UniProtKB/Swiss-Prot annotation:
SMART domains noted in UniProt: RPOLA_N (SM00663)
GO molecular function: DNA binding; DNA-directed RNA polymerase activity; magnesium ion binding; zinc ion binding
Encoding gene per record: rpoC
Any one Gene Ontology BP term: DNA-templated transcription
NCBIfam families, sorted: PRK14906.1, rpoC_TIGR
Subunit structure: The RNAP catalytic core consists of 2 alpha, 1 beta, 1 beta' and 1 omega subunit. When a sigma factor is associated with the core the holoenzyme is formed, which can initiate transcription.
Keywords tagged on the record: DNA-directed RNA polymerase, Magnesium, Metal-binding, Nucleotidyltransferase, Transcription, Transferase, Zinc
Gene3D superfamilies per record: 1.10.132.30, 1.10.150.390, 1.10.1790.20, 1.10.40.90, 2.40.40.20, 2.40.50.100, RNA polymerase II, clamp domain, RNA polymerase Rpb1, domain 3
Protein name per Swiss-Prot or TrEMBL: DNA-directed RNA polymerase subunit beta'
Positions contributing to Mg(2+) binding: D535, D537, D539
EC numbers on record: 2.7.7.6
Source organism: Mycobacterium bovis (strain BCG / Pasteur 1173P2)
Catalysed reaction, written as an equation: RNA(n) + a ribonucleoside 5'-triphosphate = RNA(n+1) + diphosphate
Binding site for Zn(2+) 1: C60, C62, C75, C78
Cofactor(s) needed by this chain: Mg(2+); Zn(2+)
């Protein structure tokens, strides 16, 4: 049987009226929903049981048949099938419309698909559909041509008749006038009386002429309209149309409303139209060609997909199942209903009224009005508010239509398909659990009991504590004593997942082994707080339970916290000692001169003191109080490895072995610290600042297995907390010391500030200069107070200990507390020239407090905005990169990128590249790295870790070629070798790893730390965008603010300095055409760069520039970089620019993550010439598809298509993805679905999102095909065992089982007695 959940692709298309009737289980004829008295559905109404199925399981409407035995019977009284009530979730109905209507998506979308197909302007289309104009649907050209002369003669006769009548009337009137005048003259009337009569007569004659002329014009209009009549012609004048129908009705047909559109589509020849459009594209120019291209996209979509365009005009409307638009009774007898029911009711009401009017033979104008209203009600049902005012419900709220159910964050896609609520989960407040191991978490007993309830119940039955599941459930609910023992047993080895929202990167969900704890709070290991970004001020976390064996295995192996020590963004450890732990280890390893029991060399008759034969002896002395752990001593060590240089000196080539003794001059604290490190790690004899601790853990992560690192950080945590407690570091008011010299320092600077103020008042300085001078003065003052403060504080001051150890805070904060706050900024980011002279210890004056709050509030507002922006950036990044999955081991490409390892200084020494951590580190080498003598230092295909990089630098190699995602040749996704080491595991990335999502999270997660503001460089200069807006600008491939021109060619610069503008001309070296950059604003300033002679200075006249070099300050436009230097350069440019923003904030992200995103931005090619391929010019095609199609066409002897690479922003690239499901769930849902339906798009379900939406395993990690399709191959022993079955005749078993089938392995002993 076919499994409905097992399919390889999902196609979307246009439904015709036939399809809609096929899906339907019956026609909904009445607008009624349910009977308010019986609360049962009305027959033929929107909830009808006959159509949609029974409301109660196995029970018909009238109650004749009840219960399962009657399954499948259709009741002859009420017509309801006896079946499960859940069919009401899947059975559809339909409404037969009395007049066709158009589908608003296809008529109103931008661009209007109906308009493009029929070549009608959307305005005209609207007039036709909403009964404001008639359209000619067909003209019998032949008949009109044959009878044209007869008709013309008839028309001539008619005109002649009108003219004759006019002439007759004029003549009669003229005669009457003559007679009247003669009569007046005879009476001897006055002249003005005669003039009045004459004027009146002439006026009447003029009216006769005008009337006749109007009639002649009308006839002329009718005739000319008729002779030029063509299909798709609009006639807005109703009288004109009526005349045409009366006179020439047999020569043409016309109509208004959706019926006319339906007729036009029926008569539309898609193939002929496509051919004529292709012809226009080949030979046309300008606007005409562009319009033809756009129309061809729509026409070709119908031509290729085999969709019938008739689907855009509906004769029947589907009614979705009633359970999806429920109606529920509230307390108080009122009903709450889905908006869809109201929208359907309007459609049915109007449809029934229209049917009645047609049956009654109502006048056309009334029928047309009703048809228009029907069209509007169907529009509102499909997409309310798309045209005109939206239909509103009670309280003027727009009703939610079918489109609104899909759109947006609350729509079906994002609310229910991409994120679901799950059972077996709970949440609670977190507290710190310092006694836990790294892989453990404390789970409250009550919560654990509820989570593991089914497991506990089953185990109770197994152990005979309970007779059946029901009594077991009762035991659990009453919390009997046996339950707790069973719970302990059940949770052992069963990991749980902990998650803290917001989950910004993959470490936001980790697996732990639960330990039962009293209380109601979850206990969290202190070292994982960094990864979760958790603190204990009331944060909550959610617990989830992996149920299946596979889920548990994945949680344990892949997600256990002790396996996730490294950051996926930088590959460096995240589980580091922090805060108290740092302080404790810093205290432990500090050396205090003159402390108790310090080593004293022998002098005179005093022997040397403070020398110990072993750490144990030293600890004994410390316990007796004669030695301080921080005093310098000499101690003989046998179990700790000496530092590298001492080891080389003492033990030579053979090296130190455990048990070899050596003397160390150190402190007991440092010996104790080193005993925490793994055996064989060289002795570290220095004070443990946070940076040193980080370096050690980094080194451990590079050289030791993860489990050793996890154990070590756990030991460091325990020691850190222990010694932090022992150190007694606390902060009180008495520790905040105000420097005594502060007043005199400030007085001195006050004088300088007064001088500047006076100069300003005299007019010697302008406002800006005065501000700059004051800012400079007060900056110096603040620094000097800080200096005085540092000198005044003793080294053992707790505040200084906390800051110096790197636990938290920095010296600026100490200065603010005890020295002076200094200058503060206003919301624009400019310094206010009055400093805050008080410290927080002394207290601020009212004015100081006020100006201080100014910038602080801006900071808070910024943070709120930044969080939302950063989340949206992450969402777009995930969307664009979600289908980048490692698909194969090696794509065998020879290409790669060159990265710098070091720079040669003028004296020949190597200066290590500061960005080596994010560029060369953790890459796969693309070619052998060879030194000057030709020795291979590191072979091709090796992973560059810290040891390899050190070896390369030692050999004097300054740059290497490494494999990169940018040059990977895998068609979908990337290969493992090009991606290199997985930052999170420290090993080569596994096939199936979703590196795209990891990349998006690594870039998005620190997004909140990036500043919002665009910072001002130098006074009035152009704003240079920085921080988050700059990252968005780069990833969206926008033209940057303050765009800087780049050199199109290599050549000499000619610089013309105008009044407000520069004009730069480049004279190319190859003698080509000169390139001129005109009107470059002087506010932008010329670029400073290295010249041929090695000096760094501003660009000036006569300088030599290379192609692609930036000429002005600011940012280059990536599209120009692509045009001038090609795709490879623009990729490197984007990676470099994004990294600059993150580095400015001190965030370390590996280049490879940014490369993954940039690769997606440059995935497409725009077709310039289609050659012999099916591609349309101007369309965007995936590069892999483009190359494959070209290879195919060339092999068949055709012309390949020509295309050029195009850089797309991440939003555009996400919407251009091949998967319509993924695009629709991202943004612009209705537009994506409209397009996909017309093209009859098929979703191959390659990415992650699409599979999440339809509820399949995602094709990443263990869900990838190569891991799912596994057959068990028997071992040789099993095969041999298979042959030991007593053999019958040969024909039963073929002698060879072959590799394909696998041998039959007996599972239990056969009893053969029956056969004998």
């Amino acid at each position: 049987m076919l499994d409905v959940n097992f399919f390889d692709e999902l196609r979307i298309g246009l439904a015709t009226a036939e399809d809609i009737r096929q899906w339907s289980y019956g026609e909904v004829k009445k607008p009624e929903t349910i009977n308010y008295r019986t609360l049962k559905p009305e027959k033929d109404g929107l909830f009808c049981e006959k159509i949609f199925g029974p409301t109660r399981d196995w029970e018909c409407y009238c109650g004749k048949y009840k219960r399962v035995p009657f399954k499948g019977i259709i009741c002859e009284r009420c017509g309801v099938e006896v079946t499960r009530a859940k069919v009401r979730r899947e059975r559809m109905g339909h409404i037969e419309l009395a007049a066709p209507v158009t589908h608003i998506w296809y008529f109103k979308g931008v661009p209007s698909r109906l308009g493009y197909l029929l070549d009608l302007a959307p305005k005209d289309l609207e007039k036709i559909i909403y009964f404001a104009a008639y359209v000619i649907t067909s003209v019998d050209e032949e008949m009109r041509h044959n009878e044209l002369s007869t008709l013309e003669a008839e028309m001539a006769v008619e005109r002649k008749a009108v003219e004759d009548q006019r002439d007759g009337e004029l003549e009669a009137r003229a005669q009457k006038l003559e007679a009247d005048l003669a009569e007046l003259e005879a009476e001897g009337a006055k002249a003005d009386a005669r003039r009045k009569v004459r004027d009146g007569g002439e006026r009447e004659m003029r009216q006769i002429r005008d009337r006749a002329q109007r009639e002649l014009d009308r006839l002329e209009d009718i005739w000319s309209t008729f002779t030029k009549l063509a299909p798709k012609q609009l006639i807005v004048d109703e009288n004109l149309y009526r005349e045409l129908v009366d006179r020439y009705g047999e020569y043409f047909t016309g109509a208004m409303g959706a019926e006319s559109i339906q007729k036009l589509i029926e008569n539309f020849d898609i193939d002929a139209e496509a051919e004529s459009l292709r012809d226009v594209i080949r030979n046309g120019k300008g606007q005409k060609k562009l319009r033809a291209l756009k129309r061809l996209k729509v026409v070709a979509a119908f031509q290729q997909s085999g969709n019938s365009p008739m689907g855009m005009v509906l004769d029947a409307v589907p009614v979705i199942p009633p359970e999806l638009r429920p109606m529920v009774q509230l307390d108080g007898g009122r009903f709450a209903t889905s908006d869809l029911n109201d929208l359907y009711r309007r459609v049915i009401n109007r449809n029934n009224r229209l049917k009645r009017l047609i049956d009654l033979g109502a006048p056309e104008i009334i029928v047309n009005n009703e048809k228009r209203m029907l069209q509007e009600s169907v529009d509102a049902l499909f997409d309310n508010g798309r045209r005109g005012r939206p239909v509103t419900g009670p309280g003027n709220r727009p009703l939610k239509s079918l489109s609104d159910l899909l759109k947006g964050k609350q729509g079906r896609f994002r609310q229910n398909l991409l994120g679901k609520r799950v059972d077996y989960s709970g949440r609670s407040v977190i507290v710190v659990g310092p006694q836990l191991k790294l892989h453990q978490c404390g789970l409250p007993k009550l919560m654990a009991l509820e989570l593991f309830k089914p497991f506990v119940m089953k185990r109770l039955v197994d152990l005979n504590h309970a007779q059946n599941i029901k009594s077991a459930k009762r035991m659990v609910e009453r919390q009997r004593p046996q339950v707790w023992d069973v719970l302990e047993e059940v949770i052992a080895e069963h990991p749980v997942l902990l998650n803290r929202a917001p989950t910004l990167h993959r470490l936001g969900i980790q697996a732990f082994e639960p330990m039962l704890v009293e209380g109601k709070a979850i206990q969290l290991h202190p070292l994982v707080c960094e990864a979760f970004n958790a603190d204990f001020d009331g944060d909550q976390m959610a617990v989830h339970l992996p149920l299946s064996a596979e889920a548990q295995a994945e949680a344990r192996i892949l997600m256990l916290s002790s396996n996730n020590i490294l950051s996926p963004a930088s590959g460096r450890p995240l589980a580091m000692p922090r805060l108290d732990m740092v302080t404790g280890l810093y205290y432990l390893t500090t050396e205090v001169p003159g402390d108790t029991g310090e080593y004293q060399p022998a002098s005179g008759d005093h022997p040397e003191t403070g020398v110990y034969s072993s750490p144990a002896e030293a600890i004994m002395a410390a316990d007796r109080g004669v030695l301080s752990v921080r005093a310098k001593i000499k101690v003989r060590l046998t179990q700790l490895r000496p530092p590298v240089e001492i080891e080389a000196e003492l033990f030579g080539h053979s090296g130190w072995q455990p048990g070899d003794a050596w003397m160390a001059e150190t402190t007991l604290g440092r010996v104790m610290f080193n005993e925490l490190l793994p055996l064989g790690y060289p002795f570290v004899n220095k004070q443990m600042h946070k940076k040193v601790q980080a370096a050690i853990i980094n080194d451990l992560a590079e050289r030791y297995p993860m489990i050793v690192v996890a154990q070590t950080v756990d030991k460091l945590k325990d020691a850190g907390f222990y010694w932090a407690t022992r150190s007694g570091v606390t902060v009180s008011m008495a520790d905040v010391l105000v420097p005594p010299r502060k007043k005199e320092i400030l007085d001195h600077y006050e004088e300088r500030a007064d001088k500047v103020e006076k100069q300003f008042q005299r007019g010697a300085l302008n406002h800006d200069e005065r501000n700059e001078a004051l800012v400079e003065i007060w900056k110096e003052a603040t620094d000097e107070v800080g200096q005085a403060l540092r000198e005044h504080y003793p080294d053992d001051n707790p505040i200084i200990t906390i800051v110096d150890s790197g636990a938290t805070g920095n010296f600026t904060q100490t200065r603010t507390l005890a020295g002076m706050k200094g200058l503060v900024t206003n919301p624009k980011g400019e310094f206010i020239p009055r400093p805050v002279k008080s410290s927080f210890r002394e207290g601020l004056t009212v004015l100081e407090y006020f100006i201080n709050t100014h910038g602080a509030r801006k900071g808070l507002a910024d943070t709120a905005l930044r969080t939302a922006d950063s989340g949206y950036l992450t969402r777009r990044l995930v969307d664009v990169s979600q289908d980048v999955i490692v698909r194969e081991h090696d794509c065998q490409t020879e290409r790669g990128i060159v990265v710098e390892l070091a720079e040669r200084a003028p004296d020949g020494t190597l200066i290590r590249d500061p960005y080596i951590e994010t560029s060369a580190y953790a890459r796969t080498l693309g070619t052998d790295a060879v030194d000057e003598a030709g020795n291979v230092i590191v072979e091709r295909g090796q992973d560059l870790g810290d040891p390899e990089i050190d070896a390369l630098l030692a050999a004097g190699i300054t740059q290497v070629k490494v494999r990169s995602v940018l040059t990977c040749a895998t068609s979908t996704g990337v290969c493992a070798t090009c991606y290199g080491r997985s930052m999170a595991t420290g090993k080569l990335v596994d096939i199936g790893e979703a590196v795209g999502i990891v990349a998006a999270q690594s870039i998005g997660e620190p997004g909140t730390q990036l500043t919002m503001r665009t910072f001002h460089q130098g006074g009035v200069g152009e704003d240079i965008t920085g921080g988050l807006p700059r990252v968005q600008e780069l990833f969206e491939a926008r033209v940057p603010r303050g765009k800087a021109p780049i050199a199109d060619v290599t050549g000499r610069v000619r610089l013309e300095d105008g009044e407000r503008f520069y004009k730069i001309t480049i004279v190319p070296d190859d003698g080509g055409e000169e390139v001129v950059y005109d009107k470059i604003s002087k506010r932008q300033r010329l670029r400073v760069f290295k010249h041929e002679d090695g000096s760094e200075r501003v660009l000036s006249d006569g300088d030599h520039v290379e192609v692609g070099q930036q000429l002005m300050e600011g940012s280059a436009d990536p599209h120009e970089v692509l045009r001038v230097q090609g795709p490879r350069e623009v990729q490197i440019h984007l990676v470099r620019e994004v990294q600059e923003v993150y580095r400015a904030q001190g965030v370390s992200i590996h280049d490879k993550h940014i490369e993954v995103i940039v690769r997606q931005m440059l995935r497409r090619v725009t077709i310039i010439d289609s050659g012999s391929t099916e591609f349309l010019p101007g369309s965007l095609i995936d590069r892999a598809e483009f190359e494959a199609e070209n290879r195919r066409v060339v092999a068949e002897g055709g012309e390949p298509a020509a295309g050029r690479p195009v850089l797309m922003g991440i939003t555009k690239a996400s919407l251009a993805t091949d998967s319509w499901l993924s695009a629709a769930s991202f943004q612009e849902t209705t537009r994506v679905l409209t397009d996909a339906a017309i093209n009859c798009r098929s979703d191959k379900l390659n990415g992650l999102k699409e599979n999440v939406i339809i509820g399949k395993l995602i094709p990443a990690g263990t869900g990838i095909n190569r891991y799912r399709n596994i057959a068990v191959q028997p071992t040789e022993e099993a095969r041999a065992a298979a042959y030991t079955i007593p053999s019958y005749e040969d024909q039963y078993y073929s002698p060879d089982f072959g590799a394909a089938t696998g041998a039959a392995v007996p599972l239990d002993d056969y009893g053969y007695s029956d056969y004998r």
